[in-house]
From Swiss-Prot:
CTP binds at G32, R35, R116, D159, R162, R165, R168. Its cofactor is Mg(2+). This is CCA-adding enzyme. A single active site specifically recognizes both ATP and CTP and is responsible for their addition. One of its GO terms (biological process) is tRNA 3'-terminal CCA addition. Belongs to the tRNA nucleotidyltransferase/poly(A) polymerase family. Bacterial CCA-adding enzyme type 3 subfamily.
Amino acid sequence: MKLMTMPSEFQKALPILTKIKEAGYEAYFVGGSVRDVLLERPIHDVDIATSSYPEETKAIFNRTVDVGIEHGTVLVLENGGEYEITTFRTEDVYVDYRRPSQVSFVRSLEEDLKRRDFTVNALALDENGQVIDKFRGLIDLEQKRLRAVGKAEERFEEDALRIMRGFRFAASLDFDIEAATFEAMRSHSPLLEKISVERSFTEFDKLLMAPHWRKGISAMIACQAYDYLPGLKQQEAGLNHLIVSLKDNFTFSDHHQAWAYVMISLAIEDPKSFLKAWKTSNDFQRYVTKLIALYRIRQERSFEKLDIYQYGKEMASLVEGLRKAQSLSVDMDHIEALDQALAIHNKYDIVLNGSHLIKDFGMKPGPQLGLMLEKVELAIVEGRLDNDFTTIEAFVREELAT
């Protein structure tokens, strides 16, 4: 197969391939970018593989950076762009089902492609637009099928994260997993416990944000892979609820919304501990935990002005997005009106602060001062007090007198 026209991302990188070829080596576009071009999807990263060894690659170009030279990768700075160029390589026995014990550089494109996970990711493209397909990846692309390169059992024993990648690709590409590949994923799912939680989180997160995320979750359920992921053991019912409880065409707006609804579906009692088990950041934990709290408030009643002040319009909109997907009542205009009606959006908008209370009222730093500032803040938010210096002073004077 030959591409009639190269996408602009590849055209810009063609001089890189030409330079390598002129130096006497092979060079190709490889991996997901080739797959996405053939599927007419946007390209995110342009990866180049070459028969030149790292030191040989560095000798060809004036500006390079060693970004992963032990794995054969050199970053080339050329024509205003940055390109990762990786030497063809083979990988020795994998350690802990996660990483190869040794990487060996080779001159053969086929040897390089055969170590990849799925046939649709094992395609290469030369400078003339000719697709090199050593493992029937083009047929799999046409039939929307995800199939492991070579023996599926070996691929998942080498790196068990490929199981999670399989679920993610099913979700992002809307592909079905080939039977033998699926069976190997199912039988090797216990190996997911050997994988770092951070790597599993990244794949699961991408799955949730994919347009066909239900397909990925369904495959995970069928493989019983969830039993080997943090907080998901024996959660088949909750995961099924996740799939069926939202409208068919719904996709999550952002990562926080996705993980919040996962925990809502699973009826997780301690969201922060659940997210800690996934080794997420403290900021992520705080935001998602607040989002779940706001969702539960909204299930009981309509939003009030204080809700929008404390949680923010953006978070309230994420909650309404989930409610809409559940065919529940939503009122985005109400959220907007409440936000517009707020005299302040945070405590720093208040014209009077703690220093004024200390100076003008002789208050001392401590709990009493903090409590007074909270009273002022709440009164302004609820509309009982104008954000005006004189008015606030009168309010404080009255509070101190009681």
